[in-house]
A protein has these predicted regions:
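Terminal catalytic/cofactor-binding subdomain
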Residues: 1-116
């Protein structure tokens, strides 16, 4: 039970990181559409896309026998409830690393989605 304002303040203070430990990270959420009919792609296409991304060094995240995401280093690509995918990027030191990570991710996505 909270009995004082100081308890709340101390709780938030306990989560403060030192400046030397600051990092940045990116998240990209993508809704994917079929260019032939402009409809959202279904799980079977996402499964194909995830399988193709394995060639870029991604590792599968499985639920039973279904691939529901990928990881590589500190990055994850996950299947979200609306059938969209989301990249959760690595913890990086500066914006230039985040830019490079985004460019690499988008390059890989373009390579595999053009073949679907």
């Amino acid at each position: 039970m909270i009995t004082s304002k100081e308890q709340i303040i101390n709780y938030f203070k306990s989560g403060i990181k030192e400046t030397k430990d600051f990092r940045i990270g990116i998240e990209h959420e993508k809704f994917l559409f079929d260019n032939k009919n402009n409809k959202r792609i279904d799980y079977s296409k996402i499964k194909q896309m995830f399988a193709a991304l394995l060639e870029f060094g991604w590792n599968p995240i499985l639920e039973k026998n279904n691939i529901i995401g990928l990881n590589k280093g500190g990055k994850n690509i996950t299947l979200e409830p609306g059938n969209q995918i989301e990249l959760s990027g690595d913890k990086l030191n500066h914006i230039h690393e985040a830019c490079a990570e985004s460019q690499d991710y988008l390059f890989e996505l373009r390579q595999v989605t053009q073949k679907l």
